[in-house]
Amino acid sequence: MSILALPELLPPTHTVPKCASMDLLNGSAYTWEQRKLGEVADIVGGGTPSTSNDDYWDGDIDWYAPAEIADQIYVASSERKITQQGYDNSSAKMLPVGTVLFTSRAGIGKTAILRKEGCTNQGFQSIVPHINELDSYFIFSRSEEMKRYGETVGAGSTFVEVSGKQMANMELMMPTTMEEQVTIGSFFSNLDSLITLHQRKSKIGKMPLK
């Protein structure tokens, strides 16, 4: 969602954060700078344990596949789980809380924020924010921008895929301070909560009366 469109979407009691309205809406870049994603985050791929070894599966380690990333903002439990043995014998990497999962194939650009550490298959190039350099919800709020970038630069003989190196080279305009990032991230978090609440009320209102 473009920040330029936000004032028209918000209720009267909600306003665009000052740092966003002052700098983006008025075209000033005083408190913003251009950074490469790889400068403020690690881009981490995934892997899959052998599916023919039962000892690798049905453990207690969350292991995500692109198909289970949809419209949710946060994820805390995967559909399939792997064992420590399966993890040790694959290229999967443990991702900390706050990681933004980013699907890199089979539909580039689906995102979700980890609420519990876990790992993924090779269909992801996940974004692990550097402490005090990148706010999880701030970068999550740039999902559409990252999706467009991934679809543009991705290449593959069978299907489009974006690599970790390509994601790390993505250039973003971002606040120079974490305080501004957190302010914007919190704003979008509250906005998403309002939208979710409105959608729930809308569904309830459309339910047939018995």
Regions inferred by a protein language model and the residue ranges of each:
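Proline-centric
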Residues: 1-13, 27-28, 126-135, 167-182
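Non-catalytic DNA-recognition/assembly elements of restriction-modification systems
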Residues: 15, 24-47
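Hydrophobic (often cysteine-bearing) scaffold residues that line and stabilize catalytic clefts
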Residues: 17, 33, 135, 159, ...
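Extended intrinsically disordered, low-complexity coil regions enriched in Ser, Thr, Gly, Ala
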Residues: 11-12, 30, 195-209
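Extracellular/lumenal glycan-associated surfaces
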Residues: 3, 39, 182-194, 198
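DNA target-recognition domains and sequence-specific DNA-contacting regions of bacterial/archaeal
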Residues: 38-174
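Loop/turn elements at beta-strand to alpha-helix junctions within RNA-recognition modules
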Residues: 155, 176-178, 193
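Hydrophobic topology marker
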Residues: 6, 18-21, 208-210
